[in-house]
Swiss-Prot record:
Function: The glycine cleavage system catalyzes the degradation of glycine. The P protein binds the alpha-amino group of glycine through its pyridoxal phosphate cofactor; CO(2) is released and the remaining methylamine moiety is then transferred to the lipoamide cofactor of the H protein.
Family affiliation: Belongs to the GcvP family.
Annotated EC: 1.4.4.2
Name of the protein: Glycine dehydrogenase (decarboxylating)
Essential cofactor(s): pyridoxal 5'-phosphate
GO molecular function, one term: glycine binding
Length: 934
């Protein structure tokens, strides 16, 4: 029998599924759906919500269709610039990092002991950024340059002394950056003033911050030292956008006095990809480190005193501070940040300088030939030419040679050089302008003299052999899906199939500039159109935008749509967002960013939203009610049977219903939020639809809406007032083929079966583990959704063993831990997904049962509460060969199920890490080698 793609994506075969359903207590998947989901929202299994999807095809057929789409695109030599440049990705990084499941299937490193490899790689990224910008602390990536600028704006406001609501931005910022800044500023009451700051200086009046860019959109390089000093004298802080390649030659903003730097690392080996994904960055002075949004890797020490990496200052994050968080950013761009970091490690400081000099040299040749047509005589890679009335003709002549220039206006053309620019390209550009070659023009820029990238990480791995082994040594320290299931609740760590991943590096997708003429991208635009219609069909909504490049940004875009809808109707008073106490912290943070007040709705003891409290809150805020944000199924892992009534209550009060799509893997093919009461949802393509998590990004968070909100979806970032939320119109377009391939190969029947299998597997684990770790919440008929919460609180009270102990001990058993203490402290949330077979589920069950037996040993006094296999976990190979004073044996420590157990052994790189020490002694760049010798 020929196996379909769905048969290979879904872990349990027919016999295993029969066993799973037997334990769950139902005789079929349809019976499971009827028992678990409310009948009021369940779609008919025959017609189903997926009937309009195309029938499933094989992997080879899907790849052939994708190849045809890619080949229909026109790949030219892009010299458009504006923050997107062609780059030469070293093949060693393509094969061993970008295309390696040991890297792209990992999750965010919340379990640092089994994440030391990518944490070290991210520390390299932070060091690279802080060195090149001249700043002191950088975070572990942002979503793109424009959103990084927006985060810089709010950081300036939080960290500064000024009480003004005015922000000054230089008119030479990238246009997409200006648009996103305006989108973010308006709901927060920030007034943006644009001016040519280089020419006019600072205007009169108060302002809390200034944002400039080096080089500017026109290519102009300005020394901002005097303006920064003047801004500081007036109580304002300054953020500067900085091109990292340019910073190898130009005095960086940090040395000019800037307080914050932001930008993108795209040109460090990451293809343009029609807009993304790329790792943005944000760097600050040490005084502002605790104001940084996103994730920050720091150096701490483990139980044996060895240096160890971890995520630092996590109390800043939205999971804890909710609407008071520094940002709503959760998933960022870890995989792409690591590519950029390894690009810097591979080339080193001298290699990057050489690339920068070559790029600048090509620009200087063009500038010299342009003569008096050159607009700015200070530049790095981009020159602006004044050609009155002839701009379109110049661009057309270059296009005939396969080169795409930037048409600025009828009188001006910009030309951006990059790593891939050749002498032949320069000659073709000069021919398009109708000018003869001439001597290069001195760009007149202040040359950098300070050193950078001096840490051995940037000098040791300059040969392919060294880099290959370095990447392997790092990935060996981590647990990703290539080694084990990752049962993280609310994260949906399912298979990222090779056939889905293969097209992302094809030139027809990877080498397109996001602002290229639309006629260059018919294949990708067809793919995007397919996805928009398929996702609308799956969710029951009427329109979809793929622009948001993370779930957090999809949330934000959806809430902005609701806000603008109310404002257009004259309901300016509707500014209150109701959020259940069980909600993901991102919800509250997104609401605050959208200018909404957050009011928390209580949950009942069974985990459901308390409708009585909801009615009371609606009454209390009737005139001000904007919306409710509800996750469905809930973050408590159950299908709330009163969801339709909840939606009706809010609608009757004039509010909108935002259904968080984080748990859509429990709905696809069964129920549609747009049909059971939702007005808007965001989806997570990196959860439900197979884009890999990449160790913390990339993600894609499309926003789907009913027809009345469609006009409020984000628009083209090159158009002012478009309410764009990302730098590129289609966000992280180059990874959309992954989701397209998944839906195309699964078909309607496969998608529905995947959902039901995920639900069946979660209920199987709940049934098997309930007597050892009580399942905290169940819905009607005792069912859970696609995840379940295991309650350890009574065990902790009785024995002192915590969820942290259990999470660390699971590493000794070869597993990544489930989600800890969310949404309820002292619990573990488990989500197996549809991709794990019965053998893997049973291995996890056996590990958890064995851990329960160890907990009982502690409770019985056999092992002391402070010295037992759980409190000592995880155990490294190094600790085995040292002095052993523990009351349990070495074998129990590292082979808890016996030496003969067949499961591959995972050796954590470090012992348990001291988080508090790392936060008290914050170090966020590569430590000196002496730290490892102490």
């Amino acid at each position: 029998m020929t196996r379909s793609f769905a048969d290979r994506h879904i872990g349990p075969d027919a016999a295993e599924l029969s066993r799973i359903l037997e334990v769950v207590g139902v005789d079929s998947l349809d019976a499971l759906a009827a028992a678990a989901l409310p009948a009021s929202i369940l779609d008919d299994a025959g017609a189903g919500p997926l009937a309009a999807l195309p029938p499933a095809v094989s992997e080879h057929e899907a790849l052939a269709e994708l190849a045809a789409l890619a080949q229909s695109n026109t790949v030219t030599t892009s010299m458009i610039g504006l923050g997107y440049y062609d780059t030469l990705t070293p093949p060693v990084l393509v094969r061993n990092l970008l295309e390696n499941p040991a890297w792209y299937t990992a999750y965010t490193p919340y379990q640092p002991e089994i994440s030391q490899g990518r944490l070290e790689a991210l520390l390299n990224f932070q060091t690279m950024v802080s060195d090149l910008t001249g700043m002191e602390v950088a975070n572990a990536s942002m979503l793109d340059e424009a959103t990084a600028a927006a985060e810089a704006m709010t950081l300036l406001r939080r960290a500064g002394r000024s009480r003004s609501n005015r922000l000054l931005i230089d008119a030479d910022l990238f246009p997409q950056t200006r648009t996103v800044l305006h989108t973010r500023a308006e709901p927060l009451g920030i007034e943006i003033v644009e001016a040519d700051l280089a020419a006019a200086g600072l205007p009169e009046g108060g302002f809390f911050g200034v944002i400039v860019q080096v080089p500017g959109a026109s290519g102009r390089v300005v020394d901002w030292t005097a303006l920064i000093a003047a801004a500081h004298e007036r109580g304002a802080l300054v953020a500067a956008g900085a091109d990292l390649l340019a910073m190898t030659l130009i005095v960086p903003p940090g040395e000019q006095g800037a307080d914050v730097c932001f930008g993108t690392t795209q040109r460090f080996g990451v293809p343009m990809g029609f807009g993304g994904p790329h790792a943005g960055y944000l760097a600050v002075r040490s005084a502002h480190a605790r104001q940084l949004p996103g994730r920050l890797v720091g150096v701490s020490k483990d139980a044996d005193g060895n240096p160890a990496y971890r995520l630092a200052l996590q109390t800043r994050e939205q999971h804890i501070r909710r609407e008071k968080a520094t940002s709503n950013i959760c998933t960022a761009q870890v995989l792409l940040a690591i590519v950029a970091a390894m690009y810097a490690c591979y080339h080193g400081a001298d290699g990057l300088r050489a690339i920068a000099r070559r790029v600048h040299g090509h620009a200087a040749r063009i500038a010299g030939a342009l003569g008096e047509a050159l607009v700015h005589d200070t530049y790095f890679d981009t020159v602006l030419a004044r050609v009155p009335g002839h701009a379109e003709a110049v661009v057309a002549k270059a296009a005939a040679c396969g080169i795409t220039l930037r048409l600025v206006d009828p009188d001006h053309v910009a030309v951006a050089c990059d790593e891939a620019t050749t002498d032949a390209h320069v000659e073709a550009v000069l021919d398009a302008f109708g000018v003869a070659p001439a001597e290069p023009v001195d760009a007149g820029i202040a040359t950098r003299t300070s050193e950078f990238l001096t840490h051995p990480a940037f000098t040791r791995y300059r040969t392919e052999t060294a880099m290959l082994r370095y990447l392997r040594s790092l990935s060996d320290k981590d647990i990703a899906l290539d080694r084990s299931m990752i049962p993280l609740g609310s994260c949906t760590m399912k298979l990222n199939a090779t056939a889905e991943m293969e097209p992302i590096t094809w030139p027809g997708f990877a080498k397109l500039h996001p602002y290229a003429p639309v006629e260059h991208a018919p294949g990708l635009l067809k793919l995007i159109g397919d996805l928009e219609s398929w996702l609308a069909e799956i969710t029951g909504y009427d329109a979809v935008s793929l622009q948001p490049n993370a779930g957090s940004q999809g949330e934000y875009a959806g809430l902005l749509a609701i806000r603008r809808y109310h404002l257009d109707r004259g309901d300016t008073h509707r500014d209150t967002c109701l959020i259940p106490s069980s909600a993901h912290g991102t919800n509250a943070a997104s609401a605050a960013m959208a200018g909404l007040r957050v009011e928390v709705v209580k949950c009942r003891e069974n985990g459901d939203v308390d409708l009585d409290d909801l009615r009371a809150k609606i009454t209390d805020h009737a005139e001000r009610l904007a919306c409710i944000m509800i996750t469905y199924p809930s973050t408590h892992g159950v299908y709330e049977h009163e969801i339709a009534e909840l939606c009706a209550l809010v609608h009757d009060a004039g509010g909108q219903v935002y259904v968080d799509g984080a748990n859509l893997n429990a709905l696809v093919g069964l129920a549609r939020p747009g049909r059971f009461g939702g007005d808007v949802s965001h989806l997570n393509l990196h959860k439900t639809f197979c884009i890999p998590h990449g160790g913390g990004g990339p993600g894609v968070g499309p926003v789907a809406v009913r027809a009345h909100l469609a006009q409020y979806l984000p628009g083209d970032p090159l158009e002012s007032g478009s309410h764009a939320v990302s730098a590129a119109r289609y966000g992280s377009a180059s990874i959309l083929p992954i989701t397209w391939a998944y839906i195309r190969m699964m078909g309607a029947e496969g998608l529905r079966k995947a959902t039901l299998t995920a639900i069946a597997s979660a209920n199987y684990l709940a049934r098997r583990l309930d007597e050892y770790f009580p399942v905290l919440y169940t819905g009607e008929n005792g069912m859970v959704a696609h995840e379940c919460i295991l309650d350890l609180r009574e065990l902790t009270k009785r024995t002192g063993v915590t969820v942290d102990d259990v999470a660390k001990r699971l590493a000794d058993y070869g597993f990544h831990a489930p989600t800890m203490s969310f949404p309820v402290a002292g619990t573990l949330m488990v989500e197996p997904t549809e991709s794990e077979n019965l053998a893997e589920l049973d291995e996890f069950v056996a590990a958890m049962i064995a851990i329960r037996a160890e907990i009982d040993q502690v409770g019985a006094g056999v092992w002391p509460a402070e010295d037992n296999p759980l409190r000592g976990a995880p155990h490294t190979a190094e600790c085995l060969v040292g002095e052993w004073t523990h009351p349990y044996s070495r074998e129990i420590a590292v082979y808890p199920r016996g030496l003969g157990h067949a499961r591959a052994k995972v050796w954590p790189a470090v012992r348990r890490i001291d988080g508090a020490y790392g936060d008290r002694n914050l170090v966020c760049s590569c430590p000196p080698l002496e730290a490892y010798a102490e």
